[in-house]
């Protein structure tokens, strides 16, 4: 392998993960830190790495960069043609039925900025959470959803046209990270569920939403959704009529953090603040 590539990869890894981690035989870092490393390598070395690439060692990273350097860098448009083109139509189609069926109550919508980017971070109790959040928001919401919902060409096209993009849970999904960054950098609202899965009670939050806010400077808007678990509990296919409330909390604005190690460290503290804010909204 070219010595220059090895040196540059090692320098980037040391900057992002710290000298001790970068110099060890294995890159002992979580999926978010490895995603941070991948994006830093792309930015500084001018390459596009494979979305499904996994770095277990520094040699893995060097091999990935060496292979990527022989390929043209991908398009800056990571969202594809037609992304979100049916959002207003979906909002209009869902609005009246959801408000009627679930007596939808919306509180604190003034917390959502009238323009510019923001990350809406909500608890996740039910499959109804996404449509209820989309209807409650005063602006269109782009959102990431589990890849299983995109099975089949028709479902994939429909979700894409409504502003959804898939995320593979349980590991590093660079395509989802890139899409999320692109949405926020375009000044849009991004909906995220930091618990990572549906649960009857509020679970620990993953740091992705906080990291995204720190990476872009976008504010975090905590959201508490109550009633959807009763309307459509996990495992149910037929929703029941009941009341649903969507509460938007005051914005959490951690500011932009340009230093990768500091960003990773701060993301954990901001995540705790975010979870506490959502918990308070659910108790109201």
Where are these regions (language model features)?
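Short, hinge-like loop/turn segments at secondary-structure boundaries
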Residues: 68-69, 124, 160-162, 237-241
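Catalytic core of membrane glycerolipid acyltransferases/transacylases, capturing the structured
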Residues: 114-171, 179
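Helix-to-loop junction immediately C-terminal to a conserved catalytic motif
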Residues: 94-124
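Short, flexible loop segments at the rims of nucleotide/cofactor-binding pockets, characterized by
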Residues: 61, 96-101, 120-121, 166-171, ...
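Short hydrophobic helices that act as membrane-entry/anchoring signals
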Residues: 84-103, 156, 160-163
């Amino acid at each position: 392998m070219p010595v220059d590539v090895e040196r540059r990869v090692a320098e980037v890894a040391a900057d992002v993960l710290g000298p001790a981690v970068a110099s060890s035989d294995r890159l002992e870092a979580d999926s978010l830190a490895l995603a941070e490393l991948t994006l830093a390598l792309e930015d500084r070395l001018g390459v596009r790495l494979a979305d499904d690439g996994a770095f277990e060692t520094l040699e893995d990273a060097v091999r990935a960069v060496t292979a990527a350097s022989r390929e043209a860098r991908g398009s800056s448009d990571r969202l594809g043609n037609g992304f979100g083109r049916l959002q207003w139509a979906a909002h209009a189609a869902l609005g009246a039925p959801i408000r009627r069926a679930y007596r939808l109550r919306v509180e604190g919508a003034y917390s959502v900025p009238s323009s510019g980017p923001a990350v809406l971070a909500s608890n996740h109790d039910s499959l109804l959470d996404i449509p209820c959040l989309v209807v409650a928001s005063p602006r269109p919401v782009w959102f990431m959803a589990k890849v299983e919902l995109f099975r089949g060409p028709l479902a994939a096209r429909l979700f894409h046209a409504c502003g959804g993009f898939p995320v593979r849970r349980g590991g590093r999904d660079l395509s989802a990270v890139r899409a999320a960054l692109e949405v926020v950098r375009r000044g849009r609202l991004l909906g995220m569920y930091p618990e990572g899965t549906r649960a009857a009670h509020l679970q620990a939050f993953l740091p992705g939403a906080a990291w995204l806010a720190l990476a872009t400077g976008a504010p975090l808007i905590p959201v508490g959704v109550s009633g959807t678990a009763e309307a459509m509990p996990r495992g149910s296919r037929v929703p029941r009529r009941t009341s649903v409330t969507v509460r938007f909390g005051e914005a959490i604005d951690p500011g932009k953090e340009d230093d990768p190690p500091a960003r990773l460290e701060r993301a954990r503290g901001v995540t705790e603040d975010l979870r506490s804010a959502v918990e308070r909204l659910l108790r109201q």
